[in-house]
């Protein structure tokens, strides 16, 4: 199993290196960081523009710039922004913000999706299954930013109905919050509910559909009937044998689900005013900053890499054939 995971990790690292190479080269070709400087009125002298281009390394070939960038990136130095600020410093501050959303959203969304999907398969075509299926399809067909705004409107109505600020929907914390550690922690959790719920709903809707189909494929298999014939109750046969087998394809899907959440986090952070990686990505593209976009690509790729590695571990734990081979 260790050799299997080592091979998978090596494959992921190669893909991460390829993603960083393509992102850096393509953004370097598409971006023009000096455009805002050249469009100033009055236009700066050409010597000033050339000096700025030299500072940003724009007077060197793209491959040479990438080689220099990646040689520093492996040591944690992702260069500077076009304004001269260290990318690594801002990256370290924003990673925690985005991971908070991604971890909470993916964990709750995955667990809820698996439970709902398995429950729907066991109670196929009953009222609860039809309701869950309809709701899942409705969430899947609704863009993330629409779901986020609907949750904000719902929070406004709840706050107005109860007469207190039960849900906060702007920023990561309330400015000037007083009190001890528990008060500040409670404030952060209060701000975390709506954005993480937005991501969790999208994840739960997708996972529930796949889990339901996987569970339905298992329910009619011979080993379930054999387990029942040996005296196991239906509940125990489904939980011990059916659900375990149905979770195997879900382990592979987990990495792709996390990749979708990383994309959805861009909209969620902008809508809820969270200063994370998604919001920074939008700013980096608008300012045509290659170093910012490349650094965020490495972060996003690393998150998907870890999710893929975790899915491989879960897959190996669920499927004995992987451990034996």
UniProtKB/Swiss-Prot annotation:
ABC transmembrane type-1 domain sequence ranges: 102-310
GO MF entry, a single one: transmembrane transporter activity
PROSITE patterns recorded: ABC_TM1
This protein's UniProt keywords: Cell inner membrane, Cell membrane, Membrane, Peptide transport, Protein transport, Transmembrane, Transmembrane helix, Transport
Pfam families: BPD_transp_1, BPD_transp_1_N
Domain of life: Bacteria
Record-linked InterPro entries: BPD_transp_1_N (IPR045621), MetI-like (IPR000515), MetI-like_sf (IPR035906)
Residues annotated as transmembrane: 12-32, 102-122, 135-155, 189-208, 248-268, 290-310
Listed GO CC annotations: plasma membrane
Biological process (GO), any one: protein transport
Compartments reported by the entry: Cell inner membrane
Membrane topology classification: Multi-pass membrane protein
Quaternary structure, from the entry: The complex is composed of an ATP-binding protein (OppD), two transmembrane proteins (OppB and OppC) and a solute-binding protein (OppA).
Protein's job: Part of the ABC transporter complex OppABCD involved in the uptake of oligopeptides. Responsible for the translocation of the substrate across the membrane. Glutathione (GSH) uptake by mycobacteria through the OppABCD system contributes to the depletion of the GSH pool in infected macrophages, which impairs the ability of the macrophage to detoxify methylglyoxal (MG) and contributes to enhanced production of inflammatory cytokines.
Family assignment from sequence similarity: Belongs to the binding-protein-dependent transport system permease family. OppBC subfamily.
Protein name: Oligopeptide transport system permease protein OppB
